[in-house]
Regions:
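Acidic/His- and Gly-rich active-site-bordering loop/insert found
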Residues: 2-109, 128-133
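Acidic/histidine-rich catalytic neighborhood of metal-dependent amide-processing enzymes
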Residues: 112-137
Length: 137
C-alpha cells in the first residue's frame, strides 16, 4: 500500500488534467434533466483514463468501473446544476468560468462536479497503484 503522502503527490501531478476536465464539464449547461453534455464529457474522460468499463444507463447516468470483481466500491455524485439566473448578476461567464492559482469558478464547480472529477481521478490512481482490492470493481 502506498503511503498517503505518495498518493497526494501522485494526485497533484494530475492537477492540470483535473482542472481541464472540470472546466470542460462546466462549459456546458447541465440543468436537471438536461445533463447529457456533462454525461458525455465524463464518459469520454473515463475512457481516456482506461476505466475497465464505462456505461451510460437508460436514465442517463454515467457509470465507470475500475476492476473486474463482483463487489463494488462506489462513489455517487450528481452532475446536474441549477440555472444561472440573471446573467448580469455574474461577474464572469458561469459557463466559461475562471481560474487562478487557488480557485476554479463556474456553474457546478463546487456542487458537485468538482467532487466527481476527484472521484474519477481517484479511481485512476487506485487502479494505477493496485489499490483496488481483489474481487472489487
Amino acid at each position: 500500500m502506498l503511503d498517503f503522502n505518495k498518493i497526494k503527490e501522485v494526485a497533484q501531478g494530475y492537477q492540470a488534467d483535473m482542472t481541464a476536465f472540470l472546466r470542460a464539464i462546466v462549459k456546458n449547461p447541465g440543468e436537471s434533466c438536461d445533463e447529457k453534455a456533462h454525461v458525455e464529457t465524463i464518459a469520454a474522460e473515463m475512457k481516456k483514463l482506461d476505466f475497465d468499463e464505462v456505461v451510460i444507463d437508460p436514465q442517463g447516468n454515467v457509470i465507470g468501473y475500475m476492476g473486474t470483481g463482483d463487489k463494488i466500491i462506489a462513489f455517487d455524485g450528481h452532475i446536474d446544476t441549477v440555472g444561472i439566473g440573471n446573467i448580469n448578476n455574474w461577474t464572469f461567464d458561469p459557463y466559461d468560468g475562471y481560474e487562478n492559482e487557488t480557485e476554479i469558478g463556474g456553474r457546478g464547480v463546487s456542487d458537485q462536479c468538482g467532487g466527481v472529477v476527484s472521484a474519477v481521478y481517484g479511481a485512476k490512481i487506485m487502479k494505477d497503484y493496485n489499490l483496488i482490492p481483489e474481487g472489487y470493481k
